[in-house]
């Protein structure tokens, strides 16, 4: 919060930009260390020694070996960082001295109000008050907490999750928005020097134009699917410009599907828009928090599945079912379908390693339940993942000769054949019904008008989706089915969050130390149709407790030709 106030008040000055634009110095780089002889600063320790210590600490943190960071290493890294701080202060003082020598005074920037707007202040106040209420009576020591108290502690820490993520994204947004086009050439999250080429042919039901731009050679991390904005000087409205459809670094072209309001704008530069307002998600999470504060974690209703996910409870099933999830010799897809039918306001986690058929299994479950008249929703961290599952549902429907309607709430882009694209939340929620599958991100399912609209919500790639997102979307459905693999990369996060609140949904279910789901937690897809036995053995032992096995016939997979990777690779 202190950092946010300083940034809002524009209290930070980029000394590197000041030096680069205001001085001419006989050095190759205008970095802090290269300027130290100029300003007369001398470090206490040799940079070569402290640099080696810093690398050693970074390695220890990367491999989670914090015990390797002894007092000597810590002291050397602290000395390295202290030297950087003192060097920056010395540079600032040197620049101020040069300023005082000038024949005329240079005006300083006007003070800017550092207080948040009234809506933001009210938002922060509500989060803080509810967090304090949830934490009342919860021991500070984790070892002293009951399971319910730990769940309340996690929920309290997650109430501000989206606010913290949003802050970090806004800081970067305003920094990039204020840069000159030439400066954006050096930013990997941008592309500059744009020259409009023309409009590309529209496809399918595409309602907005896609424009191609040419740009000079530069490094950029922009990828298809990224939303982009123009600089403030090129787009005074400061709103979303469009999203990247394709980018060709060799040809130097970028194709951007524009928003309607930006169809006639042709800016000199674009940068990655990483601010995604999570108003609906935050509101849903706050509603869940208020429910827990008022009624606890064991009340039936639209928050039951969310409570079970937060508390890491085994699948809640109808009375009369046995505690055994998968029966001896039972086919995995049949077991999963039976368990879905038995769910009674609970959560069914399904962990699938590489090539184990997560999407295949999920699609057959979706098809069977939708064909039985259940109201089915699908969500994931991206539209691409949602479309992939919806396409597999279509293939499964074709194999079974079953008619299933598939609807995807998108941002207006083209969708694969057979999938209806709708652009409004009202259209998407209005499509929910028997023999219809509706896909949308967590933003759709977290809305107030989506509450209790579904019998089942399938969360694909739940090993990537943040727990906070999954909890926010959970109130849309009576039951949750989590598909994914906690061993794969999680969704990137920007903010600093309390321990345990910044994990993916399936990682949370699994727990900190476990590699695979226990038999009483959910289903583990233990066969791979992709990995050669030699690769499978290694992968299974290192990542999956030795539980993953290849199906027969994969031993015939081989690389041939003059390569050192001949055979299994």
Predicted features along the sequence, with ranges:
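Generic, well-ordered alpha-helical scaffold segments in large soluble proteins
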Residues: 1, 18, 22, 35-42, ...
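Active-site-proximal helix-loop-helix substrate-binding element of RNase H-like nuclease domains
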Residues: 2-6, 10-82
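Mixed-charge, glycine-rich, non-catalytic linkers/tails in nucleic-acid processing enzymes
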Residues: 54, 58-138
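Accessory interdomain/linker segments of ATP-dependent helicases and helicase-like nucleic-acid enzymes
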Residues: 106-224, 231-236, 569
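A generic structural motif
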Residues: 210-215, 249-264
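Short beta-strand-centered aromatic/proline hotspots
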Residues: 236-249
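ASCE P-loop NTPase motor cores of helicases and related translocases
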Residues: 259-441, 547-569
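Conserved helicase motor core of SF1/SF2 NTP-dependent helicases
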Residues: 371-373, 380-392, 433, 437, ...
């Amino acid at each position: 919060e202190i950092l946010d106030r300083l940034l809002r008040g524009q209290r930070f000055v980029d000394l590197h930009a000041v030096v680069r634009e205001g001085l001419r110095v006989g050095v190759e780089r205008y970095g802090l260390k290269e300027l130290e002889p100029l300003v007369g600063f001398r470090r206490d320790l040799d940079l070569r020694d402290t640099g080696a210590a810093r690398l050693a600490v970074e390695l220890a943190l990367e491999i989670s070996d914090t015990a390797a960071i002894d007092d000597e290493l810590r002291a050397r890294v602290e000395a390295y960082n202290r030297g950087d701080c003192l060097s920056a202060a010395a540079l600032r003082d040197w620049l101020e001295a040069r300023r005082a020598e000038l024949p005329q005074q240079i005006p300083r920037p006007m003070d800017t109000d550092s207080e948040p707007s009234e809506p933001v202040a009210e938002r922060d106040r509500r989060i803080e008050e509810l967090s304090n209420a949830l934490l009342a009576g919860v021991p500070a020591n984790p070892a002293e907490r009951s399971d319910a108290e730990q769940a309340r502690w996690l929920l309290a820490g997650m109430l501000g999750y989206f606010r913290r993520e949003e802050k970090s994204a806004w800081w970067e947004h305003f920094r990039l928005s204020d840069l000159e086009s030439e400066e954006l050439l050096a930013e990997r999250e941008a592309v500059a020097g744009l020259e409009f080429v023309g409009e590309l042919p529209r496809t399918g039901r595409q309602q907005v134009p896609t424009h191609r731009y040419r740009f000079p050679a530069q490094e950029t991390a922009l990828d298809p699917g990224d939303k982009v904005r123009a600089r403030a000087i090129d787009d005074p409205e400061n709103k979303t410009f469009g999203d990247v459809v394709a980018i060709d670094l060799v040809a130097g072209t970028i194709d951007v599907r524009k928003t309607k309001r930006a169809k006639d704008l042709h800016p000199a530069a674009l940068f990655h828009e990483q601010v995604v307002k999570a108003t609906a998600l935050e509101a849903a999470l706050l509603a869940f928090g208020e429910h827990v504060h008022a009624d606890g974690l064991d009340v039936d209703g639209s928050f039951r599945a969310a409570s079970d996910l937060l508390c890491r409870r085994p699948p809640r099933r109808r009375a009369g079912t046995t505690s055994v999830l998968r029966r001896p010799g039972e086919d995995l897809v049949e077991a999963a379908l039976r368990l879905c039918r038995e769910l009674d306001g609970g959560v069914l986690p399904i962990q699938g390693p590489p090539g184990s058929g997560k999407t295949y299994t999920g699609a057959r479950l979706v098809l069977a339940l939708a064909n039985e008249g259940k109201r089915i929703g699908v969500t994931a961290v991206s539209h691409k993942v949602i479309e992939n599952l919806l396409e597999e549902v279509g293939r499964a429907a074709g194999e079974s000769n079953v008619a299933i309607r598939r609807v995807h709430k998108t941002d207006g882009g083209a969708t694969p054949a057979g999938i209806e694209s709708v652009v409004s939340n009202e259209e998407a929620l209005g499509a929910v019904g028997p023999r219809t599958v509706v896909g949308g991100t967590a933003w759709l399912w977290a809305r107030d008008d989506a509450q209790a609209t579904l019998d089942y919500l399938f969360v694909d790639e739940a090993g990537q989706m943040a727990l906070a997102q999954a909890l926010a979307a959970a109130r849309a459905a009576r039951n949750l089915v989590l598909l994914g693999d906690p061993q794969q990369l999680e969704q990137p996060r920007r903010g600093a969050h309390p321990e345990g609140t910044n994990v993916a949904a399936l990682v949370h279910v699994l727990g900190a130390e476990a590699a695979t789901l226990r038999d009483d937690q959910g289903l583990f897809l233990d066969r791979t149709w992709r990995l050669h036995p030699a690769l499978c053995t290694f992968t299974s032992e290192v990542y999956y407790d030795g539980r993953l096995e290849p199906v027969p016939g994969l031993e015939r997979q081989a690389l041939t030709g003059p390569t050192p990777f001949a055979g299994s690779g």
